[in-house]
Amino acid sequence: MATRITNQKLSKSSRAWMREHLDDPFVKKAQKEGYRARAAYKLLEIQEKYKLIKPGMTVVDLGAAPGSWSQIAGKLVGSKGLVIASDILPMDALPDVTFLQGDFREEAVFEKLLNILNGRQVDIVISDMAPNTSGNRAVDQPRQIYLCELALDFAQKVLGPNGQFVVKVFQGAGFDEFRKQVVDSFDVLKTAKPAASRARSKEVFLVGQGRKKALQ
């Protein structure tokens, strides 16, 4: 049986977060326009600025649940494209999106992904992954950078020539070192801070374009 959450059962910080969330214009907009999360508008702004995803492309979305980025990618690639959404968490089905549940680091999951690709070249890897935060920045920051490194390693394995990469990164310890890894792997690096990113958030999005022939 569902339990009703009352203000009395929430901490002061949780109540503040809930008020901010419910009042967030991007949350309201996502609900109105049918997106699964406000994060959709981050990718939409990046797409509007850089025109990364095009009809017929093959896209892999890491840490895809609940699926807002995959929603956008599926619409952009169209019927001739392919979007593979991967997450260790379950995700409700989406039209024009193939969902693969599991840890993409595991050989069995990676092999399933290759089977889905069936020889297709991956044009872009997108990642909005973030760890479950503890509130301790000394713990959360390295965890998030680690996820970024996993996403980059995956991209290096699957991207075709001139492939592209979009990844969410928290600014802080390890950011500069990770940024250099992306610089070493792509011809062009751009940094985006979409309007849908909350002002207090340390997140930015690194956009790598033109996968280098010899990845570092």
From Swiss-Prot:
Its EC number is 2.1.1.166. InterPro entries: RNA_methyltr_RlmE, RNA_MeTrfase_FtsJ_dom, rRNA-MeTfrase_E, SAM-dependent_MTases_sf. Gene3D superfamilies: Vaccinia Virus protein VP39. Its main location: cytoplasm. Belongs to the class I-like SAM-binding methyltransferase superfamily. RNA methyltransferase RlmE family. HAMAP family: RNA_methyltr_E. This is Ribosomal RNA large subunit methyltransferase E. It comes from Acinetobacter baumannii (strain ATCC 17978 / DSM 105126 / CIP 53.77 / LMG 1025 / NCDC KC755 / 5377). The gene is rlmE.
